[in-house]
Amino acid sequence: MAVVLKPWTVLVALVLCLLVCLGTFVDAYPPKPENPGEDASPEEQAKYYTALRHYINLITRQRYGKRSSPEGVMSELLFGDNSEHNQRSRYDDSYMW
């Protein structure tokens, strides 16, 4: 006997999966440090500015690597992680007659 799912149950399951996936993106960035206010002590202000500088460095950090160029990303998507494919052309193979 086949089980038939109602359309609303599929929609509810899809929405729940989407919420779980979006929840993982929220945890990806560190929380912004709280401002201690105008009447805070100099030690608290220094601690806040250190935490703020660390937060800004984390958020604006540049990612360097072998896939930093758009061509590298496209070649990896099209050909996989095989670096030999980029180095050889199709005319390098010798034809055997």
Swiss-Prot record:
Keyword DNA damage among UniProt keywords: no
Cystine pairs: none
The protein, known as: Peptide YY
The family this protein is said to belong to: Belongs to the NPY family.
Organism the protein comes from: Anguilla japonica (Japanese eel)
Tyrosine amide PTM positions: 64
Propeptide regions on this chain: 68-97
Keywords of this entry: Amidation, Cleavage on pair of basic residues, Hormone, Neuropeptide, Secreted, Signal
Protein's gene: pyy
InterPro entries, per the entry: Pancreatic_hormone-like, Pancreatic_hormone-like_CS
Pfam families documented for this protein: Hormone_3
GO terms, molecular function: neuropeptide hormone activity; neuropeptide Y receptor binding
GO cellular component, one term: extracellular space
Signal sequence extent: 1-28
GO biological process, one term: neuropeptide signaling pathway
Location of the protein in the cell: Secreted
